[in-house]
Each structure stands twice: as structure tokens, then as C-alpha cells.
């Protein structure tokens, strides 16, 4: 007698090592724009930069991705009770790479030097040039595509990255970088009421803040990078090379004195040639549950096989 059973698993197959298909395109594509913005709580024009980038992302939702790093003299906590120290060593190192000269808001687009837009001869640009630089990057061909997915079990992130080289890199070694960000961190922001009021969540200035700033939604906030600022070396960069790597990262309870909200973690993966970002992608994390409900069984299933391929 045939028994019909259907298993409903609230569990992603990849967490048990079953892989049905790749997550990266093997067709030649143009670059995505990875925008790294230097910002700070006490940068009064930074909310204007946030609003500008929000609009650009809305117009290019699958092609433009933003990472905001808090550093410099404007990135200090004005709350006597603490809880808003968004600065970190990775942000400080990143500032050394993009070279904003202390100007905020500023941003780097794919870490390219746009000589007509550059603030100090490096990759950082003032906000009046961001849209133009992003538009140029989106029209450039990429020799590598990047796919990423991130699963969260408890406070442990499992990050799966695939890359495919549709053409050979001019460099024999490339680098894979993984940024971890947190959305929806509520805290003070100078200039929010003037330049990005839609991100204000308080009806009046917060008297606990030293300058009576409003409570503001801090989005895309860089908290760490897997393998640090230098990334993970890729030594097979010729046409047809397929990269498949999985990383685990344990999220702490706090970064500095800022609580971690596990439901608001994002992950970006991008590949550089040692300086410029060639391509990348950004995703929200997917929570992984372990509840199993048995409804019915149809027939025995085969064994799942997981392969870790890189060639």
C-alpha cells in the first residue's frame, strides 16, 4: 500500500549542505555600483547625502548598493547615556583607502578615481558628483559576476558567495571582500530635520542628546568586514573560473556600545582587483528555523550531496 507523506521543513536546504543551483550568473554583465559613504552623527549635511543615495537606490534597486561607514571628527556619540558609538577600526581603515580628506558627506563609487570629481586625488567625491559617477559605473562591463546569500541561525551568520569570471582579470590575484552592516539603528543625527526628515522617528528633538538632535534611522551602517579590510585572495581569475566559498561569522551582542539587532543585519560581497571594485552584491540575511512538521509521506527520497566547487 502506498503511503503519502509530505514533509514540511522550515529549514533551508543549504543549511544541511544541499545545493540545487548556483546563485551567480554566468552571462557577461555590467558592473553593479558599490557606494561606500563616509558619514557621521554630527555631519549636518550627511542626511542630504543619505537622501540622495536613497533616491538613486530606488531608481536602481538591483544595481546600486550602499555601505555607510562612520568615522572622523563628526562620528562621536552625543548621548551621555551612550549607545551610539558607530565608529570602528574598519571604518577608519576604509577612510584611509578612499581618502576623503576629512570632508563629509563623501563617497567612493567602486573605489574608482574620477579625476574630475575627486576631493583629494583619491576615490572620495562630494555628493554633487555621486549620481554621475554611479551612472558611469553602471555602463561599464564587468569581467566577474558576484552572487551572495546569508543565513542566520541564532547569532551565527553563514555567508555563501559565488563568483564567475566571464572574462579574464588583468590581475592574477583578485580579492573577495565581505561587509557586514546593520539597518534601522535609531540614534541622533544632526541636520536630519532639514535634509532627510522622512528618516526621523521622533516627534521632537531628543533632550538627552547634547545638541538636541532628533532620533534618526541609521541605515546600511558598516559594523565589520569578514577577513578584515584586505579581504580573501582569489588566485584563479581567468575566464570561466568559478569561485564558491562559504564563511561563518559570529555576531556579538554589541559593537562598541551599540546593541546588535539580528533582524537588521545585511551582507555585501564584492571583488576588487587590489584597488578598484569590479562587481558586487548585497543581501539581507535569511533566518533559519529548525521546526519540522510532518503532514504526509509520498515516497522515499534520495540522498542530498553538497559539493564545494572552485576551478
Regions found by a protein language model. Give the residues of each.
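Generic recognition of flexible, low-complexity loop/linker segments
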Residues: 22-23, 254-257, 301-302
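Local sequence-structure signature of Cys/Sec-based thiol-disulfide redox active-site neighborhoods
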Residues: 24-72
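Short, conserved sequence motifs used for protein processing/export or organelle targeting and
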Residues: 51, 62-291
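Short, solvent-exposed loop/linker segments at the N-terminal edge
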Residues: 150-156, 300-310
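Long, low-complexity ectodomains and other extracytoplasmic segments of secretory-pathway proteins
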Residues: 287-305
Amino acid at each position: 500500500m502506498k503511503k503519502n507523506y509530505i514533509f514540511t521543513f522550515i529549514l533551508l536546504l543549504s543549511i544541511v549542505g544541499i545545493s540545487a543551483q548556483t546563485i551567480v550568473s554566468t552571462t557577461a554583465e555590467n558592473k553593479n555600483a558599490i557606494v561606500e559613504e563616509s558619514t557621521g552623527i554630527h555631519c549636518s549635511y550627511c542626511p542630504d547625502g543619505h537622501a540622495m543615495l536613497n533616491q538613486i537606490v530606488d531608481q536602481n534597486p538591483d544595481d546600486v548598493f550602499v555601505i555607510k561607514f562612520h568615522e572622523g571628527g563628526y562620528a562621536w556619540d552625543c548621548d551621555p547615556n551612550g549607545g551610539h558609538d558607530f565608529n570602528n577600526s574598519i571604518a577608519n581603515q576604509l577612510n584611509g583607502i578612499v581618502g576623503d580628506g576629512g570632508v563629509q558627506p563623501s563617497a567612493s563609487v567602486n573605489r574608482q578615481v574620477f579625476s574630475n570629481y575627486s576631493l583629494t586625488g583619491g576615490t572620495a567625491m562630494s555628493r554633487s558628483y555621486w549620481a554621475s559617477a554611479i551612472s558611469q559605473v553602471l555602463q561599464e562591463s564587468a569581467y566577474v559576476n558576484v552572487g551572495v546569500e546569508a543565513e542566520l541561525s541564532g547569532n551565527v551568520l553563514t555567508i555563501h558567495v559565488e563568483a564567475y569570471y566571464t572574462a579574464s582579470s588583468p590581475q592574477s590575484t583578485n580579492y573577495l571582500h565581505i561587509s557586514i552592516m546593520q539597518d534601522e539603528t535609531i540614534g541622533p543625527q544632526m541636520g536630519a530635520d532639514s535634509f532627510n526628515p522622512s528618516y526621523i522617528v521622533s516627534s521632537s528633538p531628543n533632550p538627552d542628546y547634547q545638541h538636541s538632535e532628533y532620533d534618526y534611522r541609521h541605515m546600511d551602517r558598516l559594523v565589520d568586514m569578514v577577513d578584515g579590510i584586505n579581504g580573501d585572495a582569489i588566485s584563479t581569475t581567468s575566464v570561466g573560473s568559478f569561485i564558491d566559498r562559504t564563511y561563518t561569522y559570529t555576531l556579538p551582542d554589541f559593537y562598541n556600545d551599540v546593541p546588535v539587532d539580528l533582524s537588521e543585519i545585511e551582507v555585501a560581497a564584492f571583488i576588487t582587483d587590489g584597488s578598484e571594485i569590479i562587481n558586487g552584491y548585497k543581501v539581507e540575511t535569511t533566518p533559519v528555523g529548525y521546526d519540522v512538521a510532518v503532514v504526509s509521506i509520498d515516497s522515499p527520497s534520495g540522498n542530498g550531496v553538497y559539493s564545494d566547487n572552485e576551478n
